[in-house]
Amino acid sequence: MDSVSNLKSTNFQNNNDPKESVEEAVLRYVGVDLKNHIKKTKKKLKKQKKRKHGSKMSHEDEDTDMDWYLKTSGSKDLRKVDDIEPNSVAVAAVAAAYNSSMREKDKRSCHKKSSNSRSERKKHRKRKSSKERKAKIKMVLDPQLTTLDDGITTTAFLPDDLIAETAFDKYVDTEKAYLAKHPSKSLEVNEDDKENNFNNNSSTLVRIYTDLEGIPNDGSYIKRTPKIPEKDVKSDDLILAPEENNGDTALLRSDIVKASVIDGAITKSIGKKFTPSEENALDQFIEEYMKIRGLDRRQMCERIWSTDGVIRDGFWANISKVLPYRTRSSIYKHIRRKYHIFEQRGKWTPEEDQELARLCLEKEGHWTEVGKLLGRMPEDCRDRWRNYMKCGSKRGSKRWSKEEEELLTTVVNEMIEEAHQYQRMKALEAANKNDRYNQMYSRGPKGKRISDNPTFKDMINWTVVSERMSGTRSRIQCRYKWNKLVTDEAARSMLSIPVSERKWLLERLKQLPKTSYSNIDWNSIATYKPGYPRTGLELRLCYEQMREKIHDFKGRSTAEIIDSLLEQIN
């Protein structure tokens, strides 16, 4: 109403002011030169005559021109400009200008709303990514020692010999209860499940287990293992806090680049002992970190063992780049063992054994708490209890008898058969379910995926093996003995290997880069020839048997040994 009244007052002033022309009124109120506008209109009329009928104007022409007013009602023809009263033209100009300003205001309002919606979506994505980042940081940076507790094991930092949470001895009784409790819960497929199978690096005395990944259905003890992919990590992907973008950042970056090219970086180090060069690379990184942060050794150890989750400066993410071919889990456990905060390490006293036994009666499995009470590393408490004290006085320390070896073989084969039966049962039940339920049913409690191709570690829980041996042998005794039995059997099978296979093996070894001789991937060699019946363990034992025939082979390099063996065969 205000705009209409203003428009009327404008017309009234134009009619009663003889000194002011229509052009001046239009120019004064809307900033439009009417003469120039009329000229433009005439030119436009001429152009429209040349165009085809029915052409449409853009929205901008409709908003800024007065052609809409020049049209007669019910007709598409334009009236002549001279036939229109000047005051009416002024009114049309004012109305057009007002309409244009309102349209611009509407556009700005719509743009503001759309920008607000975009900003809301951006904020939502930011909040979502922040939550995901916090969840990752909670797992990656300063992961707690709950990996040692049997009840709350995390897959990211699972100890290699802690196999209590396997698919076969835990899932059978608990999965249906979990699905009954959460019938509508949809478990998303985690793309990192494949990588989690390789996070269990060997950190115990037995290293041969890297060659014993699986057992076939025919009951034999050996199976070829899949090739383990290397970590695809670039040294440039440093995660540094914002305040660290200075000269210290360049120093850390240079150390990581230097350490990434050490001998053995192109080979697999899964389950292998840290070499002196790797130790030096990690120590150098920590020394530089201490200088940058102004920390002494004690403070650095407390930083490494901190579990409050507050410190988020990318320490664990950056130090894992120092050895990019090793998993973060192995580096994490190795650093914590070396830079520990506990006073006691090494030999256990009888008093400590008694205290450990007393604590395990109440807190067995909660090794973080047990370690704090005893002032020892949680891993030490766990291993001491499971490997030496759990069996008590029943644990035998003498040479294994033939009956014990047969019982151990029987127990292991029974567990392997139980694992295969479980897999067949799962496959049969999953075939009768719909796709959505299949996805849920292929997982155990807490959403952990059950592998379609279970490995030997998935099948065998050495604590259960010790219990089925009536506790006469500890879990580590059973594990050691089984490794020896398998190795002896593989060595016997290699005594009759043909000369052609020996020659093929030596030629394959000769083709390898000399830098990889210190860490040969035997499983990769075994899978090189399709349908080859030998395993990586068998090939390694075959090479070691041939190597022993060379005098003073310990003083020769691997390349020299291979050349000498090829000369003997040829």
Curated annotation (Swiss-Prot):
Annotated region of DNA binding: 367-389
SUPFAM superfamilies: Homeodomain-like (SSF46689)
GO CC aspect terms: nucleolus; nucleus; rDNA heterochromatin
Residue stretches making up the HTH myb-type domain: 340-391
GO BP terms, alphabetized: rDNA heterochromatin formation; regulation of DNA-templated transcription; termination of RNA polymerase I transcription
Keyword Nucleus found: yes
Disruption phenotype: Decreases the association of SIR2 with NTS1, decreases rDNA stability and shortens replicative lifespan.
Gene3D superfamilies, sorted: Homeodomain-like (1.10.10.60)
Biased composition annotated in UniProt, kind: Basic residues: 37-56, 108-137
Keywords: DNA-binding, Nucleus, Phosphoprotein, Repeat
Composition bias, Polar residues: 1-16
Domain called Myb-like: residue spans: 273-339, 392-486, 493-549
Disordered as annotated region, ranges: 1-21, 37-68, 100-138
Pfam families assigned to the protein according to its UniProt record, in alphabetical order: Myb_DNA-bind_6, Reb1_MybAD
Top-level taxon in the UniProt lineage: Eukaryota
Keyword Repeat found: yes
Compartment(s) where it occurs, according to its Swiss-Prot or TrEMBL record: Nucleus, Nucleolus
Phosphothreonine carried by residues: 64
Assembly: Interacts with FOB1. Interacts with the RENT complex subunits NET1 and SIR2.
Other remarks on this protein: Present with 432 molecules/cell in log phase SD medium.
PANTHER family named among the record's database cross-references: CYCLIN-D-BINDING MYB-LIKE TRANSCRIPTION FACTOR 1
Protein known as: RNA polymerase I termination factor
